[in-house]
């Protein structure tokens, strides 16, 4: 967060299409002092960076014809801002649509059914043409009042010299309505003069149904578009729910429960087993294992002892902790993640709909053509009625029904297809843009892997069976709450072992392991360092543990009365479909990057098994968001994850894809949710997105071809040559046909097979990541160096322990693996340690170093 300009967030009202958001962004960007402005049509929000005063920014928005309000400062409760983000549009549009249909159906019956197919009508209207016209006028007027928002928005935008899709809808409907009103007066005049031929002629020139149909069909399109908008703005609210509301602090030597806002830096607070850490702090008394999955996304609890740091919203799984608050309020790690999500949501680039972009040119062009058509026909001597009819025909046939429905109808069908296969696209934008992905960043835990540790290997020493090893391990681990212990318990259940050994004097030592007594024998379980204190570990078993660790597995050692009995390896194994999913993504020309907070060795092992292109290990929550920023400079990025630590990265990415088994916040922050938690659904989602986008392009192509052919015909271009002229009624019919064709084409998506990889094609603009990624990986590789020392004089395990302890006490030495049998010490270092220092350290213990490699 440091080094960035302060961002102010605003709620914008009155936007209806991409042209609106573009106008707001342009207006605010021109304000002096604004360095960056980004408007999101999906969230109706605007993020502004710079020094400009908020009142000036709001005035700029209002001058552009829209409304703006500064969002409240983030507090414990953001109910006011959250209320602004609720989806109120869909219910309103649905109500408008249903009400409109109630009046449109009888209007269509009277205008089309009776006139064209002689359907029966009430006797009072039979032959009473003026009354028929007035009834149609009434129905059309009601529908126009119901959908008055189109007229308010459309004409308001026109007056601000920024016509949008609502403008075209309003003009087309108003022109049809106005012409029909004129026809009523003309018919009434003809009726008064007993000119029945004129009355019958006028009777067929009512276009009230066109005015009403235009509004109703566009309302359908608007509702479909509103339904496609997701709930990405719920992410902040979900994040805040993770923060504890209270804390237990020590004041006047008594434990008192207070509101979280009353905790100050330096306060002493206590956390009992099963409770969440209220604020960031440092442990001053006690030890425990903390489940940090809420922040790190890793499922394995981290052992904590005195002096270690703790973070808000992490879960204390075992011991009693007394901590000193170091960061409270907006300074906690959780609050920083919340702020990152907020900023990312506000600065996410707005994606204008294709139809809205085109309508910026299309609308004024059609208006000009309609006006020019009327003028030309008047100049060549035609009557005003003839010229007006040609102008109205242009407006009616150019109605953006097909243009407006091209995207939302395809989106609706695509969303339905995705839902059937457990792939939920939360917004229209997500369905359109997912297929354009060039880079996929995958979180490891729960995405590539199952997220649940499992026993993968059992390596008993000679003379011990796997069942005996598992029985002793079970006796120890069944009293532990550690997730790795759960893996062993699950393995015992699967193996159906019923040897119930009883453990006495059970002791859990934080950061090390477990101990207890079975009959008169003392048994131990834990990591290598812990077991080495109580039993000798053969070099062959050390090498085996190294081999297991290099495969991304965690080796657990078990000993009985100073004798090692074996190793049980536990790992978060990769999902069965992960390698195939990664391969399919690569076959599409997409670069696959794995991000994880794990150590480099584990990360590389998992990455190799999955077959990803690049691995970045040791990435913290803030780091993941930063990596996504860097990757976005190379191309369009999709992030796939499931933990809260992924939320900033999911929101920052061009497309956030959440695994269904993840936390609610990750799902809320994402654009796409994979309900079945299968990585193979990622390439399936990309295929569906590409197919949908192709369908949208086909729909738009049809809409344009229709207008290119229809507009000249409506304008009467062929009248002088062939005598062809288009009645506005047929223009309306053509408009309806164009919409039908668009919907029918969209329905073809139901036949699409999204899991079929046989027709996958590589993207044309594949990106190159080697430079940025190789530099990152090289730096990580340089962090760990190894040297092998040849040592003389070591005779037993005590000698090994002495040399090991001496070497590991050196600054920069991460680990020393010593063997008196081999006469070697393999030293792993994070910093360079000279040969002279290593030699002197060993020889100070009365051993001789003969060689260092």
List where the protein language model places each region.
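Juxtamembrane coupling segments of multi-pass membrane pumps/enzymes
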Residues: 187, 196-198, 212-273, 304, ...
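Transmembrane helix-loop-helix hairpins at the membrane interface
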Residues: 92-246, 357, 458, 723-728, ...
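Conserved catalytic phosphorylation-site environment of P-type ATPases
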Residues: 295, 354, 389, 402-476, ...
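Conserved cytosolic catalytic loops of P-type ATPases
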Residues: 32-55, 205-206, 237-331, 429-473, ...
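Flexible metal-binding regulatory segments at protein termini and peripheral loops
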Residues: 1-133, 254-255, 339-347, 751-853
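ATP-driven catalytic headpiece of P-type ATPases
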Residues: 95, 314, 438-442, 448-481, ...
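Membrane-embedded alpha-helical bundles of multi-pass transporters
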Residues: 116-130, 159, 178, 417, ...
């Amino acid at each position: 967060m440091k080094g960035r300009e302060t961002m102010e967030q605003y709620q914008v009202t009155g936007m209806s299409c991409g042209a609106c958001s573009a106008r707001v962004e342009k207006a605010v960007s021109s304000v002096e002092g604004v360095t960056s402005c980004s408007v999101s049509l999906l969230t109706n929000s605007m993020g502004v960076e710079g020094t400009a005063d908020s009142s000036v920014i709001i005035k700029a928005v209002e001058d552009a014809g829209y409304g703006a309000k500064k969002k409240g400062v983030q507090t414990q409760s953001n109910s006011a801002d959250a209320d602004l983000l609720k989806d109120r549009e869909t219910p309103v549009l649905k109500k408008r649509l249903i009400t409109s249909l109630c009046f449109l159906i009888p209007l269509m019956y009277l205008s089309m059914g009776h006139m064209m197919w002689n359907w029966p009508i009430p006797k009072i209207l039979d032959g009473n043409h003026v009354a028929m016209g007035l009834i149609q006028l009434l129905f059309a007027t009601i529908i126009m009042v119901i959908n008055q928002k189109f007229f308010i928005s459309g004409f308001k935008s026109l007056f601000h010299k920024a016509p949008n899709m609502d403008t075209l809808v309003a003009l087309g409907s108003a022109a049809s309505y106005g012409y029909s009103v004129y026809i009523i007066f003309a018919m009434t005049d003809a009726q008064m003069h007993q000119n029945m031929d004129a009355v019958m002629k006028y009777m067929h020139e009512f276009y009230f149904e066109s005015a009403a149909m235009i509004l109703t069909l566009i309302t359908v399109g608007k509702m479909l578009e509103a339904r496609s908008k997701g709930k990405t703005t719920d992410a902040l609210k979900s994040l805040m729910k993770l923060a504890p509301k209270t804390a237990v602090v020590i004041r006047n030597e008594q434990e008192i429960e207070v509101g979280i806002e009353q905790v100050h830096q330096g306060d002493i607070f206590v956390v009992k087993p099963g409770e969440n850490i209220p604020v960031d702090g440092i442990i001053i008394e006690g030890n425990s294992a903390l489940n940090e999955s809420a922040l790190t996304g890793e499922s394995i609890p981290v052992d904590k002892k005195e002096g270690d740091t703790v973070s808000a919203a992490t879960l204390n799984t075992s011991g009693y902790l007394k901590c000193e608050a170091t960061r409270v309020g907006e300074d906690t790690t959780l609050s920083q993640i919340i702020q990152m999500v907020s900023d990312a949501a506000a600065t996410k680039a707005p994606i204008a709909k294709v139809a809205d972009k085109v309508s910026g040119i299309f609308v004024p062009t059609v208006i000009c053509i309609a006006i020019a058509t009327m003028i030309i026909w008047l100049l060549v001597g035609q009557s005003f009625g003839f010229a007006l009819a040609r102008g109205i025909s242009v407006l009616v046939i150019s109605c953006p029904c097909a243009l407006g429905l091209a995207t939302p109808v395809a989106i609706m069908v695509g969303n339905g297809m995705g839902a059937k296969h457990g792939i939920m696209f939360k917004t229209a934008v997500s369905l359109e843009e997912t297929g354009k992905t060039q880079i996929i960043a995958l979180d490891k835990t729960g995405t590539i892997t199952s997220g649940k540790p499992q026993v993968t290997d059992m390596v008993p020493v000679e003379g011990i069976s796997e069942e005996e090893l598992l029985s002793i391990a079970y006796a120890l681990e069944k009293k532990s709450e550690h997730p790795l212990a759960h893996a062993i318990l699950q393995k015992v259940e699967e193996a159906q072992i019923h040897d119930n050994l009883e453990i006495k004097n059970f002791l859990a030592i934080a950061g090390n392991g477990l101990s207890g007594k079975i009959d008169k024998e003392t048994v131990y379980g834990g990591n290598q360092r812990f077991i080495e204190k109580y039993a000798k570990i053969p070099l062959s078993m050390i090498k085996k543990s190294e081999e297991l660790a290099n495969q991304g597995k965690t080796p657990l050692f078990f000993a009985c009365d100073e004798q090692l009995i074996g190793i049980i390896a536990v790992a978060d194994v990769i999902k069965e479909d992960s390698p195939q999913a990664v391969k399919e993504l690569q076959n599409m020309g997409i670069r696959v990057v794995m991000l994880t907070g794990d150590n480099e060795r584990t990360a590389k092992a998992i990455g190799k098994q999955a077959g990803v292109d690049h691995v970045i290990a040791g990435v913290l929550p803030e780091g993941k968001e930063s990596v996504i920023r860097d990757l976005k400079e190379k191309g369009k990025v999709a992030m796939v994850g499931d933990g809260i630590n992924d939320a900033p990265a999911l929101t920052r990415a061009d497309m956030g894809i959440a695994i269904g088994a993840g936390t609610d916040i990750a799902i809320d922050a994402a654009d796409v949710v994979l309900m079945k938690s299968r990585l193979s659904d990622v390439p399936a989602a990309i295929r569906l997105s590409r197919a949908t986008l192709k369908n949208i392009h086909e729909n738009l192509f049809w809409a344009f071809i229709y207008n290119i052919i229809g507009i000249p015909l409506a304008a009467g271009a062929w009248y002088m040559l062939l005598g062809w002229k288009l009645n506005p009624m047929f223009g309306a019919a053509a408009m309806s046909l164009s919409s039908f064709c668009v919907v029918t084409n969209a329905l073809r998506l139901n036949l699409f097979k999204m899991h079929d990889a046989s027709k996958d094609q590589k993207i044309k603009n594949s990106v190159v990541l080697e430079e940025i990624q190789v530099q990152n990986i090289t730096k990580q590789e340089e962090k760990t160096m190894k040297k092998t020392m040849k040592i003389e004089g070591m005779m037993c395990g005590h000698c090994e322990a002495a040399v090991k302890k001496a070497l590991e006490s050196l600054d920069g030495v991460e680990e020393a693996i010593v063997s008196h049998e081999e006469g070697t010490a393999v030293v792993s270092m994070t910093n360079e340690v000279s040969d002279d220092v290593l030699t002197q350290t060993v020889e100070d213990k009365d051993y001789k170093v003969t060689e260092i490699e």
